[in-house]
Amino acid sequence: IMSKCHYKNECAYFKMRNKLKEGNRYIRLNEYKPKVIIVNQDMLMMNFKKLTFGKESLIYDDPCMLIIDEVHNLEEKQRANMTKTINSKTVINKIKEGANRVGSRSRYLKNIKMIEDWFNLQKDSAKSEIYKNGNCLSTGRVDIKPVSHHQMAKLISMTKEIVEEFDVNNIAVFKQSSLVSNEQLEIANNLLTLFKNLQNNSDKYIFWTEITKQDQIDISFCPNNIAETLRKTVFSTSYPVVCLSATITNKTNNENSYEYIKEIIGFKGYEEDIKYNDFPYKESRLYIPPNLPKFDKRDVKYYEEIGKHIFELASQNKGGTLILFTAKDDIDGVYNDLSKRKFNKTIYVDDGSKSQNEIIESFKKTKGVILGTGVFWEGIDLKNELLTLLVIVRLPFPTIDPITKYKITKLNDSNEAVIVPEMIIKLKQGVGRLVRTKQDKGLLVLLDSRMNKPIYKHKEAVLDALPIKNMIHKDEVKDFLNNI
């Protein structure tokens, strides 16, 4: 598929793959052992996947050591690598194309209609679930709507008929080319596999549904044994593996600090070592305004109150401002409020119209205000006056989606055994945007009303996770921002 892409000559990923191939060829021919090879986690996971299936390695496969940075992302990267996703529009179109090629579309109209009806049922169910949760599901992943055993049996039977027809016509015997493409056959086979797994209520897979931006439906499924797969591949090599991240400890003392991350990536490890940086966090300040609007009341009044806090804080800030959200709808609500105010700052909205890099490059020129979510929680490196005010609107608890539900079940514990460690990891990632060098200092603001409660059960865990400990009151904010 990659070789057929019209944009392959401009694609950075394609160019990198080719360079790696050339590098591997040079290594083999010259018996040269490279000292350092840098790849992203997506490519690393794909490399281990290819090795598992006995295919040629993408990268040099006999290193002296593997160092994995930002290891808190490894589980999700491996899950993405093992996930099969079926798009409703693509499935229907490819099945229709294949049926047309073999002259059997009219014969399979009933089959195709039943498959379409099932996808529409999933879309309606997903939309209902999202709206029920205030349209604020951060991952967008919801459970698949079950159908009766009889209905699923019919779906399997009808899809199997299509697969068998495509399979026969995929083989070119007396013709120059097959009638049905490999892609059409693969898509039909993936759909059949999905239906069979759903029918068997397989406990080896996690299933979920997502609504796409084009109002289509994506059905995804992946093996649930992510930790076991990582243990057998990445962590069972003949060379040592070192895992790094600034955010994977979940306790202030050293005892069992890595317990959660080790559990979800299947890495038991032989040695643990917590290193502390010497950034001057004492020079920065933490501010939690009193009387914040209730965090779970996402109405016009809520966005007005949050918008007011952001407006007042950012207006006093001479450097750049980053506002981190946990849901796109919250960005929309706050932006609608800010756009009505006489704001002397340029606002950059993470609405998908521009890439993160495009937003960052424009932001550097104006020291404005970024309203961001998702990727803006990590990987941003804005030093000195480029970022002096960081506002976190809500504590970044993960959504209880099908994947989180499975993790909770696996740990045989309450929701909090999963959602609290994941919230702390995400929170640390976000807070880490503010102080990037020994010369940096800034103001960290939390706008989550739960932090106003003296007896909030996770308050101590949140405060312990923050490297910035010195709190200030409202009447100190202006002077602090003016003196940065």
Regions found by a protein language model. Name each.
Residues 268-273, 339-360:
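Conserved RecA-like helicase motor-core motifs
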Residues 42-43, 72-73, 377:
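Catalytic acidic motif of RecA-like/P-loop NTPases
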Residues 15, 20-22, 373:
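Phosphate-interacting basic helix/loop segments used at nucleotide- and nucleic-acid interfaces
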Residues 35-41:
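Extended, Lys/Arg-enriched charged tracts that mediate electrostatic binding to polyanionic substrates
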Residues 290-300, 351-452:
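Conserved RecA-like P-loop NTPase helicase motor core
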Residues 445-484:
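N-terminal targeting/trafficking signals and adjacent low-complexity tails
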Residues 1-18, 31, 35, 48-66, ...:
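Conserved coupling segment at the C-terminus of the helicase ATP-binding
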